Amino acid sequence: DRSVSRGLGDVYKRQEEYSAARASTLNAFYTSPTVIRSMYEALENMGLKQGNILEPSCGVGNFMGLIPESMSKTNMYGVELDPVSGRIAKQLYQKNKIAVQGFEETSYPDSFFDCVIGNVPFGAYQVSDRRYDRHHFMIHDYFIAKSLDLVRPGGVVAVVTSSGTMDKQNPAVRQYIANRAELLGAIRLPNNAFQRNANTSVVSDILFFQKRDRASIEEPEWLNLKETQEGYSVNAYFAEHPE
């Protein structure tokens, strides 16, 4: 999708900013402002100007603080498990509706939001949510799955997530997502994008999904993996779109 690519173009051009970013691949507390602004720019290109926006795992509210003027009429919601970070976010952004609890404990109605945006928690662990327990989703995949239920048909889920969502051998979570949403675009971040703060080179992706009006049985290319010339297995989307 051209609007997504246009909005995220500077992610590639300004990689030097990542080395200075105090970011973490384990939570959304310190997402790089470069990444945040690029994601919002893509959403602006899609025409998002009003409605309800949710940031799950909002930390102290970095996405809230960088929301562009063009989206000033939106209603911003946030969820944060950590009580200290949650209280800071509530103090900084008093007009926003911020819940200090686990995402799995929230009870927002389905199709309530126009957009979900954020840096979801990464990790090889699960949370308990009766609606999703049978799928055994890892934490990052769970956040995406629940977010898709919370946005309206036509709504967008824009997240920074572990590359495991797109690259894991088992395609079950991708099939779950594909049944419910179209992949508008994806950007693989440099594997050192968050290294200075997190002391790790975990690979992460920015993914944009648009919720379908009805369930689909399509099997898009990004359900599957492909082997690169170097012998690595990566998602077919990235193999076909190396740019």
Language model regions located:
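Conserved ATPase-coupling elements of RecA-like P-loop NTPase cores
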Residues: Y125-D129, Q169
